[in-house]
Amino acid sequence: MYSLRRLPPLFINAHKLNAAYSLSVPTTRRSMATMKALVYAAKGKPTLEERPKPTILKPTDAIVKMVKTTICGTDLHIFKGDVATCDTGRILGHEGVAVVEQVGNSVSHFKPGDKVIVSCITSCMTCSNCRQGMPSHCTDGGWALGNTIDGTQAEYTRIPHADGSLHRVAETASDDAQLMLSDTVPTGYECGVLQGKVKLGSTVAIVGSGPVGLGALITSQLYSPLQIIMIDLNEKRLSLARALGATHTVVSGPNVVEQVMQITSGRGVDTVIEAVGIPATFELCQKLVAVGGTVANLGVHGAKVDLHLEELWDKNITLTTRLVDARSTPMLIKLVESGKIQPEKFATHNFAFGDIEKAYSVFGAAEAHDCLKVVVNF
């Protein structure tokens, strides 16, 4: 609260007048202090509600006004009950493009008016995990937004540790392209391409041509592999994958292993990226990997899977799991700005924020709507 000594005379006089005569002064405080937000109200039920507008809680916080957000497959997993850390009542969302409205006293890299990408990972930059290059496991952050704290599917969002959790946009790149750099492309790149050790002249198979699988596709090409094989049930998605640079596409079915072996002359695949998150696709990856190869899992698994060590124990394979750290975001911004990658092509549907419940309905039945990634505009 302001003290009277700091208020200009007009405000002091108004204050005295109001106190003396008990005047009722109209206010818009409620409309200014509340906002619309998409809430995990119950299992299977996204609900648009009115919530209090967030405020600065710590000097390292920023408050941002959302410009665009999107829906992640992980949000759907939350509604299925697969994410135990996310409680009902949570405002969802961990991706977005926004404008900084307010910063805490300790925020030094950003100021009100800056247009930013909101990272899906909150990083304090100082804990042992952050210093070891694993901000996804930050002891005061990590995957917090839309999980353990309120997220970006709201008109305003509080961003903890703003200096380590926001990135300035590239002015010459589209907002839709940079929205995909909040999570989708960094996840495909870091968890798939980097963990999978994609390299010059190698062979790559990506099981699942959804947004994250396509993120792995466009970034794997930075390393000039010999073959990139996309595998999916959806032929339209495979058609887009071919347009984005896949050398081969395979419609998943009873003969998928034989088809991939034919493409690779019977050797199998050096890097298999699992980008779906169900037992059947994890088993398929184990059948496709070559001797000495890597299975890089980036799918979110909500059920137990089988690891067939009776078949793999002597194949010298590597199996990796990872939560995205989003350390690659500054580099990916440069690639988008230069036109080297074009993730805006993932955006197939646009909605106004007031229609976000409909956006969830469409994204939840993505194949029926030929939907890859929805963009929600404020």
Over which residues does each language-model region extend?
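NAD(P)H dinucleotide-binding glycine-rich loop of Rossmann-like/cofactor-binding domains
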Residues: 124-207
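Mid-domain Rossmann-like dinucleotide-binding core that forms the NAD(H)/NADP(H) cofactor-binding site
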Residues: 171-254, 258-259
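C-terminal hydrophobic helical "lid"/dimerization subdomain
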Residues: 33, 235, 283-287, 326-378
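N-terminal mitochondrial targeting presequence
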Residues: 1-34
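Glycine-centered, small-residue-biased loops immediately flanking beta-strands
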Residues: 293-294
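Rossmann-fold NAD(P)-binding glycine/threonine-rich loop
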Residues: 299-316, 331-334
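Glycine-rich beta-strand-centered segment in the early N-terminal region that forms part
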Residues: 52-69, 82-131, 170-173
